[in-house]
């Protein structure tokens, strides 16, 4: 899926490298992050986001994994790591947002971690699976759709302009 995204065009980081090893791309979310225009995700009633990450460290504010969120209008969705290794999922339905965190399983530093976020529109829940364990489930009204903002979709960067650190958030 990363092949569908473009690397950030910031000329301040023209000398950056994107090393690859074992079919994985290594990037820091500061000089390298990815973006794309919205497309199929905005139309989907149900979808799964899947991430395979091996964080070497997490900032004290937490780090964005996936972001297409506007916190001012409570629109969109974001998946973030908190400073203590929990996975945070934010769903914005327009006018209100719901947040939930991994409970049963969290992310380990310097190890591969597999994260699934499964959004089920018809059933009215969102599952968070971390390393094969159903870590938490958020229930909301059945047939409730995420209201998507006009933001691009980002990997490794927070889309919300008012976040604490503009690179990763």
Model-inferred region functions:
Residues 1-169:
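Extracellular glycan-associated modules
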């Amino acid at each position: 899926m990363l092949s569908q995204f473009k690397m950030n065009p910031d000329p301040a980081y023209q000398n950056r490298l994107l090393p690859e090893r074992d079919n994985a791309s290594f990037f820091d979310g500061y000089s390298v992050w990815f973006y794309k225009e919205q497309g199929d995700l905005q139309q989907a009633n149900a979808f799964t986001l899947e991430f395979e990450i091996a964080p070497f460290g997490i900032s004290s504010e937490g780090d964005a994994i996936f972001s297409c969120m506007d916190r001012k209008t409570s629109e969109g969705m974001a998946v973030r790591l908190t400073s203590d290794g929990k996975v945070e999922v934010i769903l914005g339905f327009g006018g209100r947002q719901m947040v939930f965190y991994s409970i049963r399983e969290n992310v380990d530093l310097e190890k591969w971690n597999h994260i699934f976020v499964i959004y089920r529109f018809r059933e009215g829940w969102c599952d968070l699976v971390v390393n094969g364990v159903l870590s938490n489930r958020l229930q909301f009204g059945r047939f409730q759709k995420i209201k998507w903002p006009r933001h691009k979709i980002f990997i490794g960067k927070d889309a919300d302009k008012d976040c604490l650190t503009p690179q990763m958030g």
